[in-house]
Amino acid sequence: GKSLAYYYPSAITSDDEAIVPLPAKQVAPQNQGVAYLYYEGKFKHTDHFKTNGTKKDEGIMKNFSILDAPAKDHFGYEFKAYLRIPQTGVYNFYLYSDDGSLLYIDGKQVIDNNGSHSAARKGGKIALEEGFHEIHLLYFEDYMGEKLKLKISSRWMEEQEIPDAMLYLPLKK
């Protein structure tokens, strides 16, 4: 039979390493941070931002955070940034949220933690080439107990919240 290598604690296998990585974007962003749009409204799904919500603010922050949300309940964020990947390989992403959240990298959905729910953690993995990749995170808070954490790990990177130094502002179109 075929042998399979399993790398602890990343849970990445030799089969995962055979996945063709998404190519890096040919961009050179200069400024670090995350761009956001902030919405208020009654949401049960991230698709409801445009239909049930009102855009109240936009700006930039150092990392993905909901701590400065003006409302306690019934709000949402749409975050966009470039993620600087230090080495080609398979990366695990972990999204812990209350309520719903979705994570896309280079337009590909990596984690679906959507819907109105108490704090829940979901993960996904994706192979990425060294360089910059578009990261798009959608989050909403329905009511009671808002939480949002996005973590990353790989064979050579312990699980951690994505460091500020890996995040760059999207380029103006």
Whereabouts are the PLM-identified features?
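Gly/His-enriched, cation/cofactor- and phosphate-binding structural elements
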Residues: 1
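Extracellular/secretory pathway-exposed regions associated with glycan biology
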Residues: 4-92, 96-173
